[in-house]
């Protein structure tokens, strides 16, 4: 019931508001997956490949964008978006809302629209895993992490697009349960499709790729648990976790080429075991710096650490 100047202007039954709209009967169909033509791996040096990866739009620095708004959150930032002398984006940011409290709040996010057409379930799984991992790597307590979803989708009236949406939502449930991270909020932006005409008058339709952005927020119990991406002289660099033949739809495969591969699949049990061990080591104070491996793989991750700290690294992957 809504009144204005004591005059009733709206009286809507709550049962009707929540239950009055009839349920829709919608159909889904498995989408036709366009097989990407196999790219021939070009013979080039590791340096050339690294330069191509670093200059790709999804990896190159976005500093010119971030610094245009209040990216330091009213002077409460303790881990800022850009880290080190080289000013490189880290995995997460952290703010300290209360001056006299050791706790801080870490925030991160992840999105992998490039995987959506191949496997929307795994796309959502990768997004949740990365958003979660970024907070763990930054020092957050694994038992105090929550996530938010932001679905940016094309027309769900189309059975194949609705199927992709259903698969992504299913993954949200499965991985939120596996990681014990509740969805505390979210938003949907549907029907992002353009219908019009080209310069010849022919009708065209352009749809955005199915996209799911996962944001994560977590509590860091002590400031001493916060990590940085800038190693110090003499630090030993270790790689945690396993690498599998999962280069399909990766930045590397798009730019440089690939042999037969598949898209990344998150094994939550293996991942959580790695994250728990990292968290234990960090609480013991033996982690000086850390970075989560993301777009571009190990090569980009260690390069970010080197640029941020302006130090050289000796790497052995044998």
Map each language-model feature to its residues.
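Glycine/proline-enriched, intrinsically flexible loops and inter-domain linkers
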Residues: 1-318
